[in-house]
């Protein structure tokens, strides 16, 4: 029965928001003044010259590509038409981070790529439209939200050079990650006290440190577990490596040594300059992946003193029987903490239902490893690595929709291998 329920709970999207419109107007006024100042300080002559140079460079590139095609033999043109281009480095202009045009992958693979592109855009627009105003308003509160506008370009980079089933598999896996991120961005916007301010939804939100395994929320099907720093700090830095620089700079100016790990440093910096939403019923911190997370938890407690915090201390020697018992007791205490803070009750049925899915997803993952150990690996590239990282840590069998993706990817994998 649990698998037949819609996921995530539609009631989470329908939760009523209580936006302070005066605060939104004041923030919009401040953003407008910053934008006006940027416009005034822009060197428009240099900007115009750069656009002119780009235009001339594009004209030269088109002429160069036309000459290259004209100089090909019939067999080479047929190969280009069916299998796509091979010199992918020419898609980048010197000094630019974006490609000058989309990759030509051959007729079939270009259609596959375009279909995946359309599907992703449709999902993103559909998800954000579930509560559009708070979602879009996030861009006026937090700089990291702007970087998500580049997510489809990020997908293109992760699939560069791929063809056929390899491209299909990458699109399937990327779609699930993007859907998870889009849904949680909407929830962050709805719950944030500066933005949507939904007290109805905040009562059901349990925040946890981004490196804390999300499986603990499988036993609370009526609650919403969100890896708190994942979207504002960690995942967005995969898309835009410059996003976290202001946060690291801020926390080092605050006195944090510069030799700390940049992950917790970025989290602390985001707290220092108020770049994280104020939301949730409680927060679960942990010592994963290192002691830096413990440091970040102290910043979290100081920034939001009204948010109850439970510290999970995972044992390093996890194969030792005594540490396993200690870890189990800590998990039990964490479950009790969530029950006390939210009023929800732990469900073993819901938990084991999710773990059954997770075990099945892990079995599919091991099959990928077996194929990739051979001389004919079928699934490679960043999309595969990112999907696995997200699946085992953030999802962990909780979302029943992921099972369908795992089956599709496995079918394509074996079809290509055989």
Feature map (PLM): residue ranges:
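A charged, amphipathic alpha-helical module
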Residues: 32-41, 46-51, 55-204, 336-418
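Short active-site oxyanion
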Residues: 202-206, 281-284
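Structural motif
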Residues: 207-212, 285-289
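N-terminal glycine-rich anion-binding loop in soluble enzyme alpha/beta folds
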Residues: 222-236
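Alpha-helical scaffold elements adjacent to nucleotide-binding pockets in ATP/GTP-utilizing enzyme cores
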Residues: 299, 326-333, 337
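Histidine-anchored nucleotide/phosphate-binding helix
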Residues: 210-226, 298
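Active-site and donor-binding regions of nucleotide-sugar-utilizing enzymes
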Residues: 232-326
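Amphipathic alpha-helix face/heptad-repeat signature
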Residues: 24, 323, 327-330, 354
């Amino acid at each position: 029965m649990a698998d037949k329920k819609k996921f995530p709970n539609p009631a989470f999207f329908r939760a009523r928001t209580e936006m302070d419109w005066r605060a939104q107007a004041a923030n919009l006024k401040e953003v407008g003044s910053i934008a006006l100042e940027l416009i005034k300080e822009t060197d428009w002559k240099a900007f115009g010259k750069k656009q002119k140079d780009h235009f001339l460079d594009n004209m030269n590139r088109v002429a160069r590509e036309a000459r290259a095609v004209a100089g090909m033999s019939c067999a080479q043109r047929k190969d280009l038409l069916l299998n796509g281009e091979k010199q992918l480095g020419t898609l980048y202009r010197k000094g630019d981070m974006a490609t000058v045009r989309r990759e030509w992958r051959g007729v079939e693979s270009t259609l596959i790529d375009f279909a995946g592109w359309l599907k992703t855009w449709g999902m993103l627009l559909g998800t954000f439209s579930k509560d559009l105003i708070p979602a879009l308003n996030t861009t006026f509160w937090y700089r990291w939200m702007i970087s998500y506008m580049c997510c489809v370009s990020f997908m293109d980079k992760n699939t560069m050079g791929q063809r056929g089933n390899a491209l299909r598999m990458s699109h399937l896996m990327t779609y699930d990650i993007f859907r998870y991120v889009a849904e949680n961005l909407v929830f962050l916007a709805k719950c944030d006290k500066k933005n949507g301010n939904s007290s109805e939804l905040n009562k059901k939100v349990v925040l946890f440190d981004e490196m804390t395994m999300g499986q603990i929320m499988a036993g609370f099907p009526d609650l919403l577990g969100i890896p708190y720093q994942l979207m504002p700090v960690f995942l967005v830095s995969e898309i835009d490596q410059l996003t976290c620089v202001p946060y690291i700079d801020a926390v080092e100016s605050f006195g944090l040594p510069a030799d700390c790990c940049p992950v917790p440093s970025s989290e602390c910096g985001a707290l220092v300059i108020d770049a994280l939403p104020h939301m949730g019923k409680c927060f679960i911190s942990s010592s994963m992946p290192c002691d830096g997370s413990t440091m970040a938890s102290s910043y979290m407690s100081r920034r939001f003193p009204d948010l109850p915090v439970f510290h999970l201390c995972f044992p390093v020697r996890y194969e030792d029987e005594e540490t396993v018992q200690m870890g189990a007791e800590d998990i039990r205490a964490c479950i009790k903490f969530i029950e006390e803070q939210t009023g929800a009750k732990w469900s073993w049925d819901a938990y084991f239902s999710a773990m059954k899915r997770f075990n099945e997803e892990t079995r599919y993952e091991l099959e990928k490893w077996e194929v990739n150990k051979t001389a004919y690996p079928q699934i490679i590239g960043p999309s595969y690595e990112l999907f696995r990282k997200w699946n085992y840590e953030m999802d962990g069998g909780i979302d029943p929709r992921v099972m369908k993706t795992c089956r599709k990817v496995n079918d394509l994998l074996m079809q290509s291998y055989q």
